[in-house]
Amino acid sequence: MTVLTSAHVAREGIAVLDTAAWRACYAGVLRRHFSGAGGGTAGVSVDRVDLSTLPVRLPGVGESFGLRIAARLSSIRSHLAVRLYLDVFGFALGRSEINMEATSYVQPEPTRTEQELLLLMDRRAGLHPL
């Protein structure tokens, strides 16, 4: 959670993350960043990075975003590969920007689990308004 100067600033910060232009820019940054990842000392290369949107179902919440970053990681030595999923969610509540991340290998976290966690975060944040 990040507390900002005003509710307007929190809403604007979240709203920009839910635009196609921002996602396209961020996808390009991720692909450029990982395109040169040749393993280094970890012995792992990043073969592919994809970005997609995820639904955020929070009643009464205006600005929100959901984003999945999926990457294919390969072992330099064994050539085995695994998918990495990083799901990032955020919403504005008053002057707070609330974010949640879920990381999983092989398959993404179930949508139902993520939505239940988002609802729980929304309820808890509502109990302690800033």
Question: Model-derived features: where do they sit?
Answer:
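A short, solvent-exposed beta-edge/loop patch
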Residues: D47-R124
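A small/polar (G/S/T-enriched), proline-flanked helix-loop surface module common
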Residues: M1-L80
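A ubiquitous, low-specificity "background" feature that marks scattered single residues
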Residues: A24-A27, Y85, L93, H128
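Sec-exported extracytoplasmic/periplasmic mature domains
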Residues: V9, D122-L130
